[in-house]
């Protein structure tokens, strides 16, 4: 706050202060309303976009990936339109959800997804690839999705911990193993991605851990930036 106001020095006005106060207190839905009309060509990908795509990665695309049709190739808007009724059902959308205090990913992801696709900024983001692995023997609860922005940049989003025992067991394993199977899978997923593209890697919670781990371990320097939103046990990664 101080840095922002110092930039304006004696020229600062109550208008600047009020506008910055509004920006500082925005949530994701406010951001979509404020910047949703700007494509990525005009306003480049930023940390809030990373947060939104990290949350959207929690949506259970596997419900349709395994049952009806492949999700790859669709824009987010096309995907939601195609599966609109099921998105509501699987997401259990509550129109009155408190986005600031009720942050259970499975509940908020469908809500934010359906809101985001109504904006120019997110509607034309294309789903390039999706992978979901749940293996009790190997102790893996892993999901990742690759998006392509309207400017051609790709974003790999790693999903965090779900409500399964396997997912929580993974979190515990992160505290004493140098590498868990899910981290190895995260690196493998990125290394199998298409070359010749510019990438961002993002994730929330365990997904943030996998994003940073992948960034450190990847074979090629193809990543422009990595955003780990509340990535768990990041300190352990930095000691590897």
Model-found features: residue ranges?
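Non-catalytic, mobile gating and regulatory segments of ester bond hydrolases
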Residues: 2-202, 209, 213-240
């Amino acid at each position: 706050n101080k840095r922002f106001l110092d930039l304006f020095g004696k020229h600062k006005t109550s208008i600047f202060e009020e506008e910055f106060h509004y920006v500082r207190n925005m949530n994701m839905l406010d951001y979509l309303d404020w910047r949703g009309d700007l494509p990525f060509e005009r306003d480049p990908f930023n940390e809030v976009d990373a947060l939104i795509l990290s949350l959207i990665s929690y949506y259970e695309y596997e419900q349709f990936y395994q049952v009806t049709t492949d999700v790859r190739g669709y824009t987010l808007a096309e995907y939601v339109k195609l599966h609109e009724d099921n998105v509501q059902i699987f997401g259990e959308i509550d129109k009155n959800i408190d986005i600031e205090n009720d942050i259970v990913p499975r509940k908020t992801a469908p809500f934010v997804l359906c809101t985001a696709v109504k904006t120019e900024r997110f509607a034309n983001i294309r789903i390039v690839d999706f992978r979901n692995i749940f293996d009790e023997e190997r102790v893996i609860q892993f999901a990742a999705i690759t998006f392509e922005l309207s400017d051609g940049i790709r974003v790999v989003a790693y999903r965090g911990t779900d409500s399964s025992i396997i997912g929580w067991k993974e979190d515990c394993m992160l505290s004493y193993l140098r590498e868990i199977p899910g981290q190895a899978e995260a690196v493998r997923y990125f290394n199998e991605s298409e070359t010749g593209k510019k990438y961002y890697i993002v994730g929330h919670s365990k997904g943030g851990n996998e994003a940073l781990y992948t960034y450190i371990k990847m074979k090629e320097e193809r990543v422009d930036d990595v955003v780990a939103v509340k990535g768990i046990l990041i300190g352990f990664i930095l000691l590897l």
